[in-house]
Regions:
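Membrane-interfacial helix termini and adjacent extracytoplasmic/periplasmic loops
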Residues: 7-10, 14-15, 19-20, 86-117, ...
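Periplasmic/extracellular loop-to-transmembrane helix junction in inner-membrane transport proteins
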Residues: 7-46, 59-63, 68, 157, ...
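Interhelical loop and adjacent transmembrane-helix boundary motif
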Residues: 17-30, 184-233
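Transmembrane-helix boundary motif in ABC transporter permease subunits
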Residues: 44-75, 150, 157-158, 230-233
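Hydrophobic positions within alpha-helical transmembrane segments of bacterial inner-membrane proteins
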Residues: 46-54, 58, 84, 88, ...
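Membrane-cytosol interface at the C-terminal ends of specific transmembrane alpha-helices
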Residues: 106-141, 157, 168-172, 229
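C-terminal transmembrane helix and the adjacent membrane-cytosol boundary/short C-terminal tail
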Residues: 126-140, 144-147, 151-156, 214-236
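Transmembrane alpha-helices
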Residues: 127-128, 150-182
Length: 236
């Protein structure tokens, strides 16, 4: 029985075995925990950024106001800002004497997620906006000729642009899972708590353990490929 104590125990033993094998293979730098933190961070930041980015992209495309071009340029600038700059800004906000110091989010996964949301959201917003301005007007014109109301029209726009929106989300996920500078600044690269696969690779490099760093990089690439393949499958 899958719910029996023996099955649960065997599952726990299996996870512990995987943990021990990974830590032994990679000089006990906490690779198993780093894998868990990496995907908790990547999925959490991507989920939040997707909701914010797509909503802001839709809002920016529909809104008409003075200074809209400036807002678009600012967003495009943020799309290319070095993550370490964002990380430094978040660090200053979350440090004990900072404006958000009372939240105690510095050197936590939650603080790292905040930093990555600020990095990823402009990317998803910009890609969403670009897709909308090129295709949304024609879709809305068609919807109006069919007698659709405003809500039905926007639903049709999102449905017709789902591939473009999916690509924007996947791009954000890729940026998240590969990020080093911001998460190292905000998270502190603490073993078992805020150390990710990319910061582990950086640590191994600084220690001169290049073979293990390269192996871990290949492992990260394989995991990202598997997740991408699963996402493509379910997207269809």
């Amino acid at each position: 029985c899958r719910c029996s104590p023996s099955f649960i125990l065997s599952q726990g033993d299996g996870m512990q075995l995987i943990r021990d094998l990974l830590d032994t293979a990679f000089s006990d730098v906490g690779v198993f925990d780093a894998v868990c933190v990496t995907f908790e961070l990547a999925f959490g930041a991507t989920a939040i950024s997707s909701v914010l980015g797509i909503f802001l992209g839709l809002l920016l495309e529909r809104a008409r106001f003075a200074g809209k071009k400036i807002v678009i340029r600012v967003n495009r600038t943020l799309m290319g800002v070095p993550p370490v700059v964002i990380g430094l800004g978040v660090y200053m906000l979350l440090m004990r004497r900072g404006p958000l110091g009372r939240l105690n989010m510095l050197f936590t996964v939650q603080g790292m997620i905040l930093a990555q949301v600020l990095i990823i959201t402009p990317i998803i917003c910009g890609m969403t906006y670009t897709s909308l301005i090129s295709k949304a007007p024609a879709i809305r014109t068609f919807a109006k000729t069919m007698g659709a109301d405003s809500v039905q029209t926007e639903r049709l726009v999102i449905r017709e642009l789902k591939k473009e929106l999916y690509f924007a989300v996947v791009t954000g996920f890729g940026r998240s899972i590969s990020e080093v500078g911001a998460v190292m600044l905000v998270g502190g690269n603490i073993k078992g708590h805020t150390r990710t696969m990319t910061t582990t690779i950086s640590l191994l490099k600084s220690q001169g353990i290049f073979a293990e760093g390269l192996t871990l990089g290949v492992l990260l690439l394989i995991m990202a490929f598997i997740i991408q393949s699963l996402a493509d499958f379910f997207q269809k």
